[in-house]
Amino acid sequence: MLYPLIRKFFFSLDAETAHGIGMKGIDLMNAAGLACAVAKPVAACPVEVMGLKFPNPVGLAAGLDKNGDHIDGLAKLGFGFIEIGTITPRPQDGNPKPRLFRIPEAQGIINRMGFNNAGVDKLLENVRAAEFPKKGGILGINIGKNATTPIEKAADDYLICLDKVYNDASYVTVNISSPNTKNLRELQKDEALDDLLAQLKAKQLQLAEQYGKYVPMALKIAPDLDDEQITAIADALRRHRFDAVIATNTTLSREGVEGMPNATETGGLSGKPVFEKSTAVQKKLSIALAGELPIIGVGGIMGGEDAAEKIRAGASLVQFYSGFIYRGPDLVSEVAETLAHVMRKSV
C-alpha cells in the first residue's frame, strides 16, 4: 500500500496538523466510496465479549476520533469496533499547543492533549448522524471529566456523561487514567475508586431499567501501577460488577526513548515503547481477575504478533492508536488475520 509514502508527507508536518489532514482524508475517501480500496480485506473472527458480538477483536482506541466526527470513514477500514472520545460534559480546548509529539526512532508518541473535545452534546449529534451504529457496528464512548471540575466532584462529570451517552453507546469506557488532566489518576486509588465505581454502577442499573437495555461499562487504567494497586483495582472491579477493563493508557515513564528528540516533552508516552509495560500490567491484572471479567489489551501494538501477545496475556479484545499512525490501515488486517489464526488454534 501507499501508506509509507503518505506517512512521509504527514511526518513532515506538525503532528496535530497531520492528524487533522489525515482524518479529513479518511472522510473524503469514504464520501468518494474509496475507503475500502485503501484497506485490505479483514479476516472474519467473531467473538462475544461483554454480551456484545464483535465481527473481529480489533478495535480503534479512544483519542483518534475524540468527537465522533469520522466514525463511518474509520469503520470502512475494517475495525471490529471503534471507541470515540474522551468526551467531557462541557466543551474544552485542552492544553496549549504544541501538545502532540512523535518519536519516530522508537515508534512512539507523546501527547498532553488534555481531553480537548467539543462536549458530549456535539459528540451525540455526530453519533446519531453516523451510519455505522445504525447498521449494528459496535461503538464505544469514552467519558472523562472537565479540567475545571474539582477532583472531589469528578463523579458528577462521569455521571452526566454516562446519562447522556448511555442510549447511543454499545459500551461506555470510564477514563480515569489520562496523565494529562490534573489529579485524574488519583481516582484509581482506594476510597476514591470505590466511591466512583459505586455511583457509576448505580447509574448504569438505573439507566438499564429506564431504557430497557443493559449497556456494559469498562474502566480504563494506567500502566504506571504497582502490584498492590493492580490487585486493589481488580478487587474493586469485581466488587462493583464492572463489565470489562481496558489495560492500558499512556505511561509517564520514558524508558526506551531516553535521549531521543521530543522524549523530554511532558505528557503520556504511547506506541512501541509502552508495549512491555502495558502487557506486564495486563498480565498481572488477568491473574488478579481470574477470568471474572474481560480485558481489552491496548498499548504498543505495532504488528500482529504484538496483538497475539496481548491475547496470550489474557486479553479478549485489542485496541491500538499509535500503531495506526505508524503503520496505517494495513495494521487492521494484519492484526485481524493473526488473531483469527491464534484463536482458531486455541479452540
From Swiss-Prot:
One of its GO terms (cellular component) is plasma membrane. Binds 1 FMN per subunit. The active site is at residue 178. The keyword Ubl conjugation does not apply. Pathway: Pyrimidine metabolism; UMP biosynthesis via de novo pathway; orotate from (S)-dihydroorotate (quinone route): step 1/1. Its cofactor is FMN. GO terms for molecular function: dihydroorotate dehydrogenase (quinone) activity. It is found in: Cell membrane. Keywords: Cell membrane, Flavoprotein, FMN, Membrane, Oxidoreductase, Pyrimidine biosynthesis. It catalyses: (S)-dihydroorotate + a quinone = orotate + a quinol. Substrate binds at residues 66, 111-115, 175, 180, 249-250. It is a peripheral membrane protein. InterPro entries: Aldolase_TIM, DHO_dehydrogenase, Dihydroorotate_DH_1_2, Dihydroorotate_DH_2, Dihydroorotate_DH_cat, Dihydroorotate_DH_CS. Belongs to the dihydroorotate dehydrogenase family. Type 2 subfamily. Monomer. HAMAP family: DHO_dh_type2. This is Dihydroorotate dehydrogenase (quinone). It comes from Dechloromonas aromatica (strain RCB). The lineage of its organism: Bacteria, Pseudomonadati, Pseudomonadota, Betaproteobacteria, Rhodocyclales. The gene is pyrD.
